[in-house]
């Protein structure tokens, strides 16, 4: 992918603004720079037409029309050039650099699948989509909406799930209102797929609301309404945290069962209200971040078995996601605002940006795993929005279709966005890559 850069020189004259645009392509040095004069009230659409026309004229090769976004000082241009200059207090005598980047492809509605109950959690990998319902059922689908298999794993609503990264096999951990976590294998025999529960993780005293797993799937953390963060050994070969099996009353022998019970490695306290979302830090294998209804983000060191930092907010949190490359955080709260945090910052406010666009509580946020500028947010306003961190006032796209509150979303696969909620439907949106 190549980038187009433009230098805009502005001078105030008696009749208004005279703006000169110098266009050149970084990746194609043989294309000479080209200077144009444009009006200051030029819009993004007209700037797109001008950029494409200019590139077509100055390129010695056949040029295919491209839709661009335009960056000024790391902010995507969404207004006229004049409005941007005035709003951002850009000196009109200065040289303004405009970077033209290829627009992200729009997600198109793909699958619309009805289930029997609310969808409380959803996750996706390169093989399947996993959706969990308030009826306690885990359902697996292929990327095109075909049902692969299902299994009722919990006695009450499933509130969270995570896919354990494992090169040999697929495993899923679910947490529910029944206070337990269930670890299951996904087995494939020929064209058939099965969900096989292998471990039940017991220790929480109230509903389990949050799950996160480390990069190799050997450790899992969970949190819930008991305010506790629990650490579990989910290594396939672990026997150290296996709880003693119950014995048969009649024979005095251990029951024959494929499902074992595990207890937590450690239980950590610190939050004053429910833990509702958790992520493993990409910067340290021993750090976990949690958000709570107590208005705080907690950073935990699992080796030290305690909190090492706490970030305070004015609202109760609902969701957190972390950028794999930068370590930046996005959070959802009980208001319509998505917030961007830099937990490593020691200067000024830790909230670096607020993203305005929703009109209901933010229920779920998810960072794109390929591009560090992109993320999605789901809301009680029935929409999923796709954002670029360089445009905090206008989302790139609105993904519509849900008829009631959205409870969960996922963007683990770059070309596929999935969501589910109170309308008992799972929706997928596909991007052409």
Curated annotation (Swiss-Prot):
GO MF, any single term: ribonucleoprotein complex binding
GO CC annotation terms, alphabetical: nucleoplasm; PeBoW complex; preribosome, large subunit precursor
The UniProt record lists the keyword Repeat: yes
GO biological process terms, semicolon-separated: maturation of 5.8S rRNA from tricistronic rRNA transcript (SSU-rRNA, 5.8S rRNA, LSU-rRNA); maturation of LSU-rRNA from tricistronic rRNA transcript (SSU-rRNA, 5.8S rRNA, LSU-rRNA)
PROSITE patterns membership: WD_REPEATS_1, WD_REPEATS_2, WD_REPEATS_REGION
WD repeat boundaries on the chain: 114-151, 153-194, 203-242, 270-310, 312-351, 357-397, 401-433
Protein's UniProt keywords contain Aminoacyl-tRNA synthetase: no
Compartments where found: Nucleus, Nucleolus; Nucleus, Nucleoplasm
Its job: Required for maturation of ribosomal RNAs and formation of the large ribosomal subunit.
Stated family: Belongs to the WD repeat WDR12/YTM1 family.
Protein name: Ribosome biogenesis protein WDR12 homolog
Species annotation: Brugia malayi (Filarial nematode worm)
